[in-house]
Amino acid sequence: MLALVRELDGVAVRDVARPQRREGYIEIAVGASGLCRTDLYVADGVIPVEAPRILGHEFSGVVSYVPAGSRYTIGDRVTAFPICATDRTIAGYGGEMLGVHCDGSFAEFVSVPESVVLPIEKALSYEEAAFSEPVAAALAVLKADLKSHQRGCIVSAGRIAELVSRVLKTQGLIVPVISPQVEEIKEGFYDYVIESAATFETWQAAVRAVKVGGVIVAKSRSVRPVEVPYLELVQKEITVKAVHYGSFAQAVELLNSGALHVEDLVGNRASLLEYRDVLTSARGGEQSKQFFVF
């Protein structure tokens, strides 16, 4: 099968063996797999992995192999949570992540534990269903115990911030997206601010925008250290609530039910052989998600 592989000296498309069949694991023929910052970090060597490693973790497709006694059958349309639980796993932390610790979904086939697989509706495109992972990440902000009577905003711009806003709207929370580069932010106005870019500029804006004693929800993930305005953080007695993942099952249900629409966030579709152009485009911005399709 064809796969996009991180090797010792970079990334390349290779013809590799299909996943080895294992007890309790389902093989999925990948329909579409989305590219995110984690994939770029692996491709660029910022996140070190054991080479060779197949990249990718946001995907959906069709079941192509099931072990004996499986609740799934060949041909079922499915997606999967990309972090396989271990006894160290807490809210997705400490497990093995597809495309990092084990081979991922930038391939014609991927093998995952049946325990992380969920069915998707026929009405969903493979690209829309692949949003289940970022939707689960967006749902994590609900762990900050946000209330409808509170004033909140999302400081950032682009696809991730827009997705968080839409997810919160499904839960009855109207939270606008504010880009500090182009909009004036009301100082000390918000009960909570969701930071979703992990830059000094967005942290500075978040600290400025939140009221004394308010909450900043740290949603974004960065493998690089991020400078924050520490003195103001302390002086305003701001609480920082860091969140990782919400419910993957809830994420899939939001997409399956049609309560959440993401089709306009789907960007360019390309084959694995076009990986150089796809990676270059993704490094340039996050207004829409790039996809490999099979």
For each predicted feature, which ranges?
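Cysteine-cluster motifs in flexible loop/terminal segments that predominantly coordinate metals
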Residues: C36, F81-F109, P113-L118
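C-terminal hydrophobic helical "lid"/dimerization subdomain
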Residues: A249-F294
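Mid-domain Rossmann-like dinucleotide-binding core that forms the NAD(H)/NADP(H) cofactor-binding site
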Residues: K122-E187
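Short SAM/SAH-binding signature in class I
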Residues: Y190-S196, K289
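Glycine-rich phosphate-binding loop and adjacent beta-alpha segment
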Residues: F200-A259, F294
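Glycine-rich beta-strand-centered segment in the early N-terminal region that forms part
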Residues: P19-S33, V46-C84, E121-L124
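Residue-level marker of beta-strand positions
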Residues: E58-S60, D76-R77, F109, A140, ...
